[in-house]
Amino acid sequence: MKKASRSVGSVPKVSAISKTQTAEKIKPENSSSASTGGKLVKPGTAASLSKTKSSDDLLAGMAGGVTVTNGVKGKKSTCPSAAPSASAPAMTTVENKSKISTGTASSTKRNTSTGNKESSSTRERLRERTRLNQSKKLPSAGQGANDMALAKRSRSRTATECDVRMSKSKSDNQISDRAALEAKVKDLLTLAKTKDVEILHLRNELRDMRAQLGINEDHSEGDEKSEKETIMAHQPTDVESTLLQLQEQNTAIREELNQLKNENRMLKDRLNALGFSLEQRLDNSEKLFGYQSLSPEITPGNQSDGGGTLTSSVEGSAPGSVEDLLSQDENTLMDHQHSNSMDNLDSECSEVYQPLTSSDDALDAPSSSESEGIPSIERSRKGSSGNASEVSVACLTERIHQMEENQHSTSEELQATLQELADLQQITQELNSENERLGEEKVILMESLCQQSDKLEHFSRQIEYFRSLLDEHHISYVIDEDVKSGRYMELEQRYMDLAENARFEREQLLGVQQHLSNTLKMAEQDNKEAQEMIGALKERSHHMERIIESEQKGKAALAATLEEYKATVASDQIEMNRLKAQLENEKQKVAELYSIHNSGDKSDIQDLLESVRLDKEKAETLASSLQEDLAHTRNDANRLQDAIAKVEDEYRAFQEEAKKQIEDLNMTLEKLRSDLDEKETERSDMKETIFELEDEVEQHRAVKLHDNLIISDLENTVKKLQDQKHDMEREIKTLHRRLREESAEWRQFQADLQTAVVIANDIKSEAQEEIGDLKRRLHEAQEKNEKLTKELEEIKSRKQEEERGRVYNYMNAVERDLAALRQGMGLSRRSSTSSEPTPTVKTLIKSFDSASQVPNPAAAAIPRTPLSPSPMKTPPAAAVSPMQRHSISGPISTSKPLTALSDKRPNYGEIPVQEHLLRTSSASRPASLPRGPAMESAKTLSVSRRSSEEMKRDISAQEGASPASLMAMGTTSPQLSLSSSPTASVTPTTRSRIREERKDPLSALAREYGGSKRNALLKWCQKKTEGYQNIDITNFSSSWNDGLAFCALLHTYLPAHIPYQELNSQDKRRNFMLAFQAAESVGIKSTLDINEMVRTERPDWQNVMLYVTAIYKYFET
């Protein structure tokens, strides 16, 4: 703490002051006191504190230093030789505390371990020098000044390295959460208290050392020059050693500066990579605050009080970037390298010193040139220290809070994206199953279409039959247009069948062509492989023949060698026999010599025996050598015979194997040749087939070109119908918009709805009775149909004009009633399977409103325009007010009794069937046909099994009709079946989009805004709450924790329920209660707990998003 809170007066020194001090203090400052601070400045000294030099460490250190050292300013630190040894436990405590800090790099740990070793060795040297100086008992005023300079240097080195570590610590601690920071602050507060105790202890020790050394504490700075001269008088012999030590220190400091420059560059690159910059500046208020704390006066006392003065200020030093200060320090050392004064080092190290504020202040401080000539007064430094620390803490807290918000928003967005991906996977699976189901239904519809086509042909044949009967009875008729349209329908159906068959045959022929081409390619590839195999086999056969020839040559050479060896053995045998005979002769001679010796002169015999003995030995040695040669020759002959036998066996085996391989290769070659011939014949046949298929394909292309012209006409008709459908959808959207705009008025009539339940029950019973009556009328109509069919056969001979008009009008009316009943029964079945299976207040009031409009029969016959609303899209009565019901009762009344349908029965000539059979042969309703609201329900039929079953039931009912009824229904039944077709309402894309929007209301919002659903809903909320005060929606957690966002969002729709101008962010419970009550008043159920929302600062974003989605779904879909 003593190093961290040094005086500011020694920091903002200018170069002129440094040079003046150098001139004044060069001799007295180079006293023997330099031996006490020999190599105090080491990288490890600052590295041992590097783990705890984050922004919170420096703030705590600064606060602790200011509170303790105000009482000792202005005093001269004469003997701080015990300070390094006393600061060693402090550094140990810092190291122990730093073990719990997070985000420290591995390089800092290595520097810390190195710094511990160096600091321990430095402490040992300082203790020895302190003992030597105490034994001499010399005046130590200069020694105190020298120690002061060393302490300043150590502090400046610590501060410089702290700044470097600070930026690194900031980049490492950016991602730490709030709980870790709070724990770290508590630990640093404990550390500050410990440092306060250590400072008090060190101050006591300093006083004791001054008392022991006899230094007068009341010396003024004016007596400094006389004290230095006295010190020079007492210590003339220590100057040279001090100069050498200072030179060594200069060299070491220069090396350390280079090392710190490299580290600074690395940290700057790292900060730039993280998005920060060392060229950032404080804002205007912080600059003004920093300038007010400066003063244009610098006293010599403020320049000389060193480690003992601990009244440092945050804004009083010369601020600047770390690299600029390091470069200044290096330049100062190069300029004053030969000055050899302690004060020179003091001024240089004070320039290096940085204000020990947070890492943000170190990065945002202005350059040193802005405040280089502005010194400060002690009082202004004391006053500005606490304020600057508060500003730094506030700035750091705000940045930490902003980082936390960004981190939570990012994590929230990632979770929402993952959840949407899972939903998309599920939707994909559902769409696949839906596609399969639609495929099955398509097959059913195709079968039904085929049956309808058969029925159409059957009906056309019956019409021809009835027409022939009319011709026989000489009854005139004018239905040429109908006949033409029927024939055209038949021709068009046949054309569709022919086009489908042609397309199918073309695809089949193309498949056959592709198959044949693939087969041809495979045959060519097999032929190529066979040729390659034949070549390889031939090459192998030639190789085998060459091996056989080489083996035969080797065998002949071995045979020649064997003959030579045999001749050698025979000659050796002859030589051996000759030697044996010679040996026998010699033995006889020896025997004769023995006999002569026994009988004659022994001396001559002795010589002769000696000569004979020598000849015998020579002969024996020659015989033994010959025998050895013979044995070797025999062994060689035996070995060669064995080798020859082995080679002969191998040669025979190889010859047999080669013969077998040659036979196999010949067989394979024959087989491949036969296969190749077959492939060639197949290839020629395939080419001929391909040529024929190409001709057929050209013919089919010409037919298809002709077909496409007709199909284009049909597609134009389909596009017109789609335009009509889009117009109707826009009209439906306008009705929904009106319903939302007038929903506020409906809330005033909710009390009246309670009294209408009894009336609704009565209406329901009346409706049930009416349904029974309609069923009874249906049965009677069917009986009348049978009776009229019999009467038709009886009155064929009456007048043609009267009978024709009456029969056609009546049968048309009956068919209209039957179609209306079918549609009404289908509508009742759909309503029974809707989202509200049980009768509720809304459905009862809806039936009551519709029943109240029964006396107006004219509305039932109004033909619907393309912009008129669909009956199934009519809003429920519970969602509109009585005034709205009266205003829109005309165009959207849906449940009028079916008896009104019989009042408006159009004539047969008014139905333009031929036009729609001409334009909409595939799946379109007759647009110009007048129909009632019950007929319009066919538009909303979806493709389902129920529709196919109804089709089959209608077909079976039509099969059982009499021939007379078929004549009347022959031209209208295709129209009815086509108008009730499930595919006549909307396209599959529109249906799937409607289903998707009903299932997930955020899909349309995501398509509108782009991006994910979460981001789209967030943009929608921002757009709706734009212009509201105190509203900043950036996520779904902390942006909604005060309830104002909910109130603003609902205020856009329900301004009468929420007095937004009276709300404030402090009363959270009231805000949430108002918002939830307003939402519940329109039917939005609250899924959030008020107590939990009030208690937590960051609620669960998924629950909040679900509730906001419910609000969007209610008001926007």
Curated annotation (Swiss-Prot):
Ranges of compositional bias, category Basic and acidic residues: 120-131, 158-171, 946-956
Coiled coil spans: 168-280, 394-449, 487-807
Residues of the Calponin-homology (CH) domain: 1011-1116
Region (Disordered): 1-176, 293-323, 358-390, 919-1001
Main location: cytoplasm
Compartments reported by the entry: Cytoplasm, Cytoskeleton; Cytoplasm, Cytoskeleton, Spindle; Cell junction, Gap junction
GO cellular component: cytoplasm; filamentous actin; gap junction; microtubule organizing center; spindle
Bias-annotated ranges (Polar residues): 93-117, 293-303
Modified residues (Phosphoserine): S384, S385, S389, S868, S881, S887
Single biological process term from Gene Ontology: cell division
PROSITE patterns (UniProt xref): CH (PS50021)
Composition skew (Low complexity), residue ranges: 45-90, 358-377, 971-990
InterPro entries found in the cross-reference section: CH_dom, CH_dom_sf, F-actin_Monoox_Mical
Transmembrane segments: none
A Pfam family recorded for this sequence: CH
Keyword set, alphabetical order: Cell cycle, Cell division, Cell junction, Coiled coil, Cytoplasm, Cytoskeleton, Gap junction, Phosphoprotein
Known function: Involved in cytokinesis and spindle organization. May play a role in actin cytoskeleton organization and microtubule stabilization and hence required for proper cell adhesion and migration.
Quaternary assembly: May interact with both microtubules and actin cytoskeleton.
Family: Belongs to the cytospin-A family.
Name recorded for this polypeptide: Cytospin-A
Species, as recorded: Pan troglodytes (Chimpanzee)
